[in-house]
Amino acid sequence: FADPSRVKVYGYGGALQPEWLTADYLQTTDDLHEVATCRLSDGRCLLMATGPVTWDSNHQRIRNPYANYGCYFLTEGDNPLTIDTETFLTNWQSHADRTHTLYEVDDYAWYQGGRNLYDATRITAANPRSITLQGAQDHDTGSLTVTLSADQATAVMVGVNGQNVGQLAAVSRGEYDEMRTATATFPVTELLAANNKVTLTPVNAQAVVRLDHISLYHATPEATPNLASATFPAPDIVGLVNNQNLHADGPADMIIIIPADRKMQEQAQRLADWHETHDT
């Protein structure tokens, strides 16, 4: 961009969109909304972006299983939507990320279906698992949520910093199940500013447990940054998007999505032609 002061940002980020689409929601979100940015005196442009994880009012994480990143569109024009530093910091102070820490690795599927992935590391009675989570300050209070999966019925003991906080139980799986899931939230005290050690120990010696995620809510929020001196993550440029007017397109019965490099265009066109000929 020749003039950064004209940069405008649009999009919704990576948050999970409602899976029940109403007329009001569609009308509200039909066009991408511009996102307010904060312009600093040193030329930096700050955006409070949303990734694929958000939090509800009960401190439970909401994962968008269809995205690993939050994406926004950049363009330029007159009168970008901006907010001052005071408003930006006020918004930041109420942001849920300041009071939550998440551990989640998605690299294992129990079966070829569904949308939830799990941590590939096997947790057994002989090989318990320890995870370290960041806090905000020593002697803090909060809550710990553990969600896991198991191939057979077992209780799992949960400890935090050497203290037992409770257990959660996965029930026996059905005849056509590969596993069952369990989740529980525990109140915790005497949290540390860093290196809170969470330990998971299955009781059933035969059970194999795999973690979905662990989230920690700490009552004390992270410190508010000094905008003038703090460093912030910078986004990556994924690519260019051509101007388009999707509103001009007619209704579609099927949409085929292919990579941007168009390597699958021939196959996609063949599939589309088949459906146009055979579908009624």
Which residues fall in each region the model found?
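Structured catalytic cores of large enzymes
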Residues: D3-R262, E266-Q267, D273-D279
